[in-house]
């Protein structure tokens, strides 16, 4: 057992809590998949390294320890003085490695929310979280024996430690509640994230051509569905830590792993071939013109239909072809400006039918190294292949739900991004303010809900350029943004991120700046 990770409620600030959560995440991280931290692969985890403990205290004399299973970041036991209590579903090895010098007892319920809520006689939505709740939990668990109250306090600790380690959205909510000294109850968005952690983790790790095997339905804070079916979906950036599900096929295996371990390790299936829409510029869909499947018919951008229809549905085949109604998305040639057509897969030149969909929403033809592009901003424009410049008109997102993800965006000092005419700056967050609502489109643009013809745009391609609202019809590289799991909002073309100028919101300026990861470059979608 190395250093115990500690958090004390005494003199706690949102900063001390943030440091605690970051230390916990670091201890739990086993690697990266698609750039997102993931828990260790259980097959490579030795039992003696499987558990860690976290010390939670109110003072020098009042503290408990929570035992966490590294393979799922879950609380499996707690220690109070020289007694320890294990949840009924704790792995058998837990008591061999956790709190060994204590008298060990088994609780008569397991750690699932279903069981805990049943015993607590309250749902998660009814149980307030925050510093006060954590103080009470620590002092009660020190000596309390009432099952109902144990269950209730464990619900508090699990969410403020385990769930917060898993999600930036949840650690943010707790941080704000500590800073403002107000309790909060989990909303629909938070509950849906907690309930879908394994689904989201699996979606990311099993993704094929940037696409989840199954859509994951989250909820927004006002309980509207948020359907996530692509790695490029902007909500994926709230994941701080994934459950290990499987290694992506042909992932570069670390040479340090012993062969036998790698063979035992679970590899994701590569057989999966999703059929999805492909949303792009202005939220339009890749569409076979006029439903015509004759060879050479052009592919256009058209508004996504209300119903899923064949000429907007594409199967992402494992042979790297993209097919509608059995025919292949095919480039007419390998020169910039060549048009993209539907063609019989067997008679087309094979290389002209191969596409790779990158994690950043780029669809590229490997032979020509040209990318799928919607040069026209109007409906019905023919799609072509062009030199890759990471333009907004070259950004795509797969999935059957191509509607924009509408959310507020919080940043430095927990302030929210706000549109003001053609400017954008930070203001106190207010869910009811239209000017703080942003529509995140399939093309990577960020648009003010007040006028979705206006996109967040960096004025220039150089460090320090202000970010303002400009017409989306330009389809520029300076209008395409990627929400990354490190919290940055990243511009692919410029390799820079959104930055609150000099960490001073009173300057009322958000600028383009190289990434350094300080708080003035960290953003979060608030659902």
From Swiss-Prot:
An example Pfam family from this entry, by short name, is: RIP
Q: Where are the 2-gamma repeats?
A: 494-527
The answer, when asked if Ribosomal protein is one of the entry's keywords, is no
Q: Can you say where the 2-beta repeats lie in this chain?
A: 452-491
Task: List cystine links.
Answer: 246-268, 285-304, 328-345, 416-429, 455-472
Q: Which residues form the active site?
A: 163
| EC supergroup of this enzyme | hydrolase
Q: Where are the 1-beta repeats?
A: 325-365
Q: Which domain of life is it from?
A: Eukaryota
Q: Which residues are glycosylated?
A: 110, 360, 400
Reactions catalysed, as given in the entry: Endohydrolysis of the N-glycosidic bond at one specific adenosine on the 28S rRNA
Q: So which residues are the signal peptide here? A: none
2-alpha repeats by residue range? 413-448
Instruction: State the family it belongs to.
Output: In the N-terminal section; belongs to the ribosome-inactivating protein family. Type 2 RIP subfamily.
* Comment block on domains: The B chain is composed of two domains, each domain consists of 3 homologous subdomains (alpha, beta, gamma).
Q: What is the name attached to this protein's record?
A: Abrin-b
Highest lineage ranks of the organism?
Eukaryota, Viridiplantae, Streptophyta, Embryophyta, Tracheophyta
